[in-house]
Structure formats: structure tokens, C-alpha cells
Curated annotation (Swiss-Prot):
This is Putative membrane protein insertion efficiency factor. Belongs to the UPF0161 family. It comes from the Bacteria. Disulfide bonds: none annotated. GO terms for cellular component: plasma membrane. It is a peripheral membrane protein. It comes from Rhodopseudomonas palustris (strain ATCC BAA-98 / CGA009).
Length: 129
């Protein structure tokens, strides 16, 4: 009786197509254009890493809006520093109010008692506090 599970697996794969297409575009950017212009993001994780994680966690619609807001904040007069993808989508967000998925100002920094930058000049590692 494996036929029903195969059917649901196929449906799940089709429903993941937009998410995978968005992540594929980010992968393409990270391996073509990003090396040419340099790795110089104002945030940790980088905007492409943030976008990939947001779309992986929340899908193309919600994750795409989160990524758009992050890209608009990543400019000389915007934010910088640690900006993590939220653990959960905002409770006030709805598919027909997509701007509510995103944080348009400030950063999603980890709580001070969870982690802090290692102080080694690179944000590649976080050390527990």
C-alpha cells in the first residue's frame, strides 16, 4: 500500500517548486555574480545566505518578502551586524498583507545571553555566552 504515499510525495514536490526555484536563483547568484562583485555584505549572515534560509523556512512568498526587506536594509544608510532569519513568521502577517512578513527597520539579532560575536574580526563563528 505505498501508492498513497507516492501520490502525496509527488504533490509535496510540486508544491515545493516555487521554493526550490527561488533558492536556485540565489544559488546561481552566489556562484556567478557574487564572486565578480566581491563578498561585501554589511550583515551576518550575508544577504544571499539570509534569503536562502528565509525561503527554505517560510517558502517563496513570505521568505521572498523577508529577503526583499533585508536587501533594502543592506545599504550605506541601512543596518549592519548580526541579522538572523526569524524563528517563526510574524503572527500579524497574512498572504494578502505580505509586507508584514518582513522587518523593514532594525535587525533580528540573537538575544545577548544566547550568542555574541567571537571578537576575532570575523563574524563566521558565534561563541556561546
Amino acid at each position: 500500500m505505498q501508492l498513497p504515499s507516492r501520490g502525496t510525495d509527488w504533490i509535496a514536490q510540486v508544491l515545493r517548486l516555487p521554493r526550490n526555484a527561488g533558492r536556485g536563483l540565489i544559488w546561481l547568484y552566489r556562484h556567478t555574480l557574487s564572486p565578480l562583485v566581491g563578498y561585501n555584505c554589511r550583515h551576518y549572515p550575508t544577504c544571499s545566505m539570509y534569503g536562502d534560509e528565509a525561503i527554505r523556512k517560510f517558502g517563496l512568498w513570505a521568505g521572498g518578502w523577508m529577503t526583499l526587506a533585508r536587501l533594502l536594509r543592506c545599504q550605506p544608510w541601512g543596518t549592519s551586524g548580526i541579522d538572523l532569519v526569524p524563528q517563526t513568521a510574524p503572527s500579524r502577517a497574512r498572504w494578502y498583507l505580505p509586507w508584514r512578513y518582513a522587518r523593514w527597520r532594525g535587525v533580528n539579532a540573537p538575544p545577548p545571553d544566547v550568542a555574541e560575536p567571537c571578537g576575532c574580526g570575523s563574524h563566521s563563528q558565534l561563541t556561546p555566552h
